[in-house]
Amino acid sequence: MIEKELEGKNIAIVAMGESQLDFHLSLIHSNVYDEVWGINCMGAITKCDRVFMLDPPSRFLDTDDAGTQTGIMRRWLPNTKTPIYTCTLDERVPSAILYPLEEVAQATDSAYFNNTVPFAFAFALYQKVNSLNLFGIDFSYKGNVHFAEAGKACCEFWLSKCIEAGMIINVAPRSGLLDTNAPIEERLYGYHRLDDPDILVIDSEGT
């Protein structure tokens, strides 16, 4: 369902990667966001307006499959009042909301979702927000390189759709998303081999 109050808003999305630290630094430096959206257990440790948790609640409540996230989610899920977008409802999580998958997929003409974060990007595109500020979305999983590469590719696919729609995308400085943490002189393949490499930066006006 379209929420008119989200159209044109400035949104922060915070996930569990190291660059989540840049979110807290941004608050220290007086940055303000219309809403903060958390990914999974970030909702339990950061004040969020919405949380995206596309795994079924039972993954956290009935199994240990989520590893070290399990304990904090078991404490938080039954008690929070923060809206949690997920794939199925569970009476033990009273604030859970079904993610509007069909509406989002139809509106964005895509159903490419191989991890939780792209669901938040697609929701933002569907709601026509003005800007996304991305923190903790790093995909630096040393033990599962394939998952990291696949997840990053899916996220960057959705960010491309957001950019094409005119959305402003800001990525945390220490995140590898969109090669943001790469030295600026190394971001243009081939040119990076020159003694004096060209540097190309696209600003929010597209110039």
Model-derived features: where do they sit?
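Metal-ion/cofactor- or nucleotide/acyl-coenzyme-handling active-site neighborhoods
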Residues: M1-T207
